[in-house]
């Protein structure tokens, strides 16, 4: 059994997930990272599990509880991206994106929430994106999954508030990770769209490749995960992305969408 806080991070073998897991370990937590990979990160406790497989998720959570006795923190980070025009993106690809980015999170929370509720405490951090309040053209399905994460997070936070379990979502912006290379690209229709698909994706990839160090993002997410109290349901990383999310709140939808078009749609 573990006397330290036990943290679980999905998608914890690379990128933001790995950085978050290492930051939590540095803060003194016992950290389990879950991913589909057979091997994990040195120094962390690895469980090979696919978050879209409910039985595998339940088995992983049961193993952690058997070994430690409790789960205090859950960071739902597992996810990937798709780019392309909506009309040319196959429905099965969009459904797979929702299965991982949204329902994978749901599977983890369904397994962990009863434990935290019974214990009378716990913290859940769901990884969202600035693309939730600022939906990006030619990344519509990714933006939609993250908007769903935000709505779900706010609802779950209020459901669990009386039980001492706090829930929030963190919305990163452009981070320099393997996420960019792993993105599934649907290039079909670029000529019809007069090259706007490729230009939009190239701009996004440039912003990501020159973006924030994942270690800084992981440190921020770790700090949010370890924060006491039910302060905010949604967090953005870095001032410029906080400014974007502020604009999304105060600007008329028509003007906001025009601004997004100028940045990523032309």
Identify the role of each PLM range:
Residues 13-14:
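Conserved glycine-rich cofactor-binding loop
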Residues 27-42:
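Conserved glycine-rich Rossmann-like NAD(P)H-binding loop of the short-chain dehydrogenase/reductase
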Residues 49-59, 91:
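The beta1-alpha1 cofactor-binding region of Rossmann-like NAD(H)/NADP(H)-dependent oxidoreductases
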Residues 85-86, 93-95:
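Substrate-binding pocket helix/loop in short-chain dehydrogenase/reductase
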Residues 109, 145-148:
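Active-site helix of classical SDR
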Residues 129:
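Residue(s) in the substrate-gating loop at a strand-loop-helix junction
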Residues 162-231:
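SDR active-site lid
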